[in-house]
């Protein structure tokens, strides 16, 4: 299991800015996974940081990326299944 803070970050992108925002997010080492999705949000990212303080700094940095209209974050408190397998405690 990874150490630190894991966060699912939903991202709303301004029209015509998806490629630019995606490129900026891909450059951040804390962005572990990045998915383009349907629905209310345009992108979903999995973030991994060492601490909640680092997560706060990262979200402020992400929110300043040109083309990002808004974000919603969910801190992962417990993983039940990963890579198709149950995770035993």
Predicted regions span which residues?
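A compositional/biophysical signature of low hydrophobicity enriched in polar/charged and small residues
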Residues: 1-89
